[in-house]
Amino acid sequence: MTLAAAAEAPAPTHAFAIAAEEVAMEPLSTATAPAAMEEESSSSGGGGGVGERRSRFRRICVYCGSAKGKKPSYQDAAVDLGKELVERGIDLVYGGGSIGLMGLVSHAVHAGGRHVIGIIPKSLMPREVTGEPVGEVRAVSGMHERKAEMARFADAFIALPGGYGTLEELLEVITWAQLGIHKKPVGLLNVDGFYNPLLSFIDLAVNEGFITEEARRIIISAPTAKELVMKLEDYVPEYSIGLVWEDQNQKQNNLVPELDSGITSS
């Protein structure tokens, strides 16, 4: 898809209102049969080659910076993560940029023959997309819709080093997991201890009674891409809050015709 075509594509309206609905559309099944996992991996839109390691994930959403960072190790980690996804037959969902760590991980996945879905607000395209876009680009109206679409397409989430935007996206999906809105694993690629201060803060919040031990275990971290993805594969969710978002969302959807009717008749 060309950059011009992506920019001209119509974006859905009511971005903030649809966020919760779209997150619940493609829940991750933790009991997918091995044969089905292998079939999904080979038919998910990427190259898919012989020798790919079997994965329960079809797509992983990667959050990361539009800058490369000062250390070469950050850049190496982005490339290594892209290669790890390729080896496991996993496609990539990301923020759509072609610069910084976003560009490195997306090019690595695309070069390996897997499918890449980039989701980016139209207003950011001139800033974060240079040259020919990588893979499939979906232009959306704003940041709320971007995050909802990324969550909807993904079966798991990984955060590489990044800044405010990366932290916002990361903490939001962690909060959604805590509330039971989704049951998808959330991982930190803790390159050179980049996320140690964040993990220390979270541990402090646990000690001070603001985060439960159970909620602390939502976050999975590892120093290398290979180790992190292995941990994500083994993740089993546990929640103390009984909110089942899919059920609540369905009840809300059933009320929509009644609400519309009431608005029309008033």
From Swiss-Prot:
Name recorded for this polypeptide: Probable cytokinin riboside 5'-monophosphate phosphoribohydrolase LOGL8
Entry keyword annotation includes Signal: no
Binding sites annotated in the UniProt record for substrate: 128, 146-147, 163-169, 175
EC number: 3.2.2.n1
Described function: Cytokinin-activating enzyme working in the direct activation pathway. Phosphoribohydrolase that converts inactive cytokinin nucleotides to the biologically active free-base forms.
Keywords from the named record: Cytokinin biosynthesis, Hydrolase
Entries under InterPro entries matching the protein: LOG, LOG_fam
Enzymatic reactions: N(6)-(dimethylallyl)adenosine 5'-phosphate + H2O = N(6)-dimethylallyladenine + D-ribose 5-phosphate; 9-ribosyl-trans-zeatin 5'-phosphate + H2O = trans-zeatin + D-ribose 5-phosphate
Gene Ontology CC terms: cytosol; nucleus
Pfam families: Lysine_decarbox
GO molecular function: cytokinin riboside 5'-monophosphate phosphoribohydrolase activity
Region (Disordered): 30-52
Gene Ontology biological-process annotations: cytokinin biosynthetic process
UniProt record similarity statement: Belongs to the LOG family.
Tissue and organ distribution: Expressed mainly in roots.
